[in-house]
From Swiss-Prot:
It comes from Strongylocentrotus purpuratus. Residues 379-389 have a biased composition (Acidic residues). Residues 417-440, 464-481 have a biased composition (Low complexity). This is Bindin. Residues 1-20 form the signal peptide. Its main location: cytoplasm. One of its GO terms (biological process) is cell adhesion.
Length: 481
């Protein structure tokens, strides 16, 4: 027999002898007469058969009792004895017809006070299924193990929740909506509307305090995001107005593009058409007709241009005082230090644009609901802008190639070169004599309407059916018309 086996045997015998030495009540007089109504004491051992209060136990007795034998006591009273006996180290529970409930509070009290339950093999716990356990009856040893596992799982869950609460405001661990990830925490649809907020107050119970701020930052219609008929948000920011940012090229409004007199602002006209991507024939519409401004009448051009640029300068999109107060309140809760004047519309636009393109800065907003809603709205706005850009580009190409429509800068008498179809023949390029040049020009018998004087802006004889004419300025007839 090896040394280790001998050591294990000695330890087992020692433990058995200790358990065998757990005392019992004798006929000797009690050492705690003040508690003789429910307890019997001898030295550091006590046996109690009534509740802690009925027995008259005191703190002095509890400070010297290290081994306790309890009879006929329910789980709640056993916990009371354990917590009020500071010196207790071993406990024996005698059922005697009293069933113990499957409550882990008893096991947790034993663990907290470092008390050993000496009769685990003989003790049973009943009515366990009523408390959610899989079996209705379990031995003390099995029940103690299950309670230990449950407590460790609860501790791990509590640590994870605390860690998540700490990490909620960590900007470095937050998913960025600009990368397509979902923002941390709840989504926008999970946020129930609230009537009050520690930052701002609102009138309606069915509207979140950040709704108008989100719509202002996003720059589109409130009907897209739960602001029904609020007069504080203008209708000029509808999705159709936003498309103009993507349909046009070179930054011009749709109805105010530069006149294409053939020179194409430094780009040579090729075969009677504008440069690739310009969206259709230069000149566009039939000869003799009035100039056409795309889908708008001529008088509406200036109005449309003014409305498309009024988001910062004022006009219909000027936000109300109540919305401005909400914006000030939300931005006041951030930790962003920028040299801007919140009352200056230009500075306010810069700040909101800065927040929009650096959305992680909004993580310092004090109200989690406002923060989540702003981040979600920004993500949705970017997706809509990408969709609008693709749709607007397709519509720009289609509208530019449509007959009678202005591909770039309006229809009517374009300057240097008409399209081959309007020259009276087929677009055959340089093959043979230009077809249609020998016939009377249809639609050009008199001074073309909208061109000022006959053939002004044509730039001399056509050279090469579409090569850039030489020498004369272009588009003068258009301007004079």
């Amino acid at each position: 027999m090896g040394f280790h086996q001998i050591l294990v045997t000695v330890v087992a015998l020692a433990l058995a002898s200790v358990r065998a030495e757990f005392p019992s009540r004798t006929d000797s007089p009690t050492d705690c007469p003040e508690a003789d109504q429910g307890c019997w004491c001898r030295g550091s051992f006590a046996q109690c058969w009534r509740t802690y209060e009925e027995a008259g136990m005191t703190g002095e007795i509890g400070n010297r009792i290290t081994k306790l034998d309890l009879l006929y006591q329910p789980s709640e009273e056993i916990v009371t004895y354990i917590r009020r006996s500071s010196a207790m180290r071993e406990l024996r529970i005698s059922e005697d017809g009293v069933s113990l409930d499957c409550s882990c509070d008893l096991i947790y009290a034993l663990d907290d006070k470092h008390v050993t339950l000496v009769d685990q093999a003989e003790l049973t716990f009943s009515n366990c299924q009523q408390r959610g356990w899989p079996r209705d009856s379990m031995t003390a040893r099995s029940f103690v193990n299950r309670c230990h596992v449950s407590r460790m799982q609860d501790g791990d869950l509590r640590k994870r929740r605390e860690s998540e609460d700490v990490d909620d405001d960590d900007v470095s661990k937050r998913a960025s909506p600009r990368k397509g990830d979902e923002p941390a925490g709840h989504t926008l649809k999970d946020l129930a509307p609230q009537n009050t907020n520690h930052l701002v107050s609102i009138d309606g119970a069915d509207k979140h305090p950040a709704d108008e701020l989100v719509n202002f930052i996003s720059g589109h219609s409130p009907t897209r995001r739960a602001t029904d008929n609020d007069a504080a948000v203008s209708d000029d920011s509808k999705r159709g107005a936003r498309k103009k940012r993507y349909v046009n090229t070179m930054g011009y409004p749709q109805a105010m593009s530069p006149q294409m007199g053939g020179v194409n602002y430094g780009q040579p006209a090729q075969q009677g058409y504008g440069a690739q991507g310009m969206g259709g024939p230069v000149g566009g519409g039939p000869m003799g007709g009035p100039p056409q401004f795309g889908a708008l009448p001529p008088g509406q051009a200036d109005t449309d241009f003014g409305s498309s640029s009024s988001s910062v300068d004022g006009g219909d999109t000027t936000i109300s005082a109540r919305v401005m107060d909400d914006i000030k309140a939300v931005l006041g809760a951030t930790k962003i230090d920028l040299p801007v004047d919140i009352n200056d519309p230009y500075d306010l636009g810069l700040l909101l644009r800065h927040l929009r393109h650096h959305s992680n800065l909004l993580a310092n907003i004090g109200d989690p609901a406002v923060r989540e809603q702003v981040l979600s709205a920004m993500q949705e706005e970017e997706e809509e802008e990408e969709e609008d850009a693709a749709t607007g580009a397709q519509q720009g190409v289609l509208n530019g190639n449509a007959p009678g429509q202005a591909g770039f800068g309006g229809g009517g008498g374009g300057g240097a070169m008409m399209s081959p179809q309007q020259m009276g023949g087929q677009p055959q390029g340089m093959i043979g004599q230009p077809q249609g040049m020998g016939f009377p020009h249809e639609g050009m018998g008199g001074p073309p309407q909208g061109m000022g004087m006959p053939h002004q802006g044509m730039g001399g004889p056509p050279q090469g059916m579409g090569m850039p004419p030489q020498g004369q300025p272009y588009g003068q007839g258009y301007l004079q018309g």
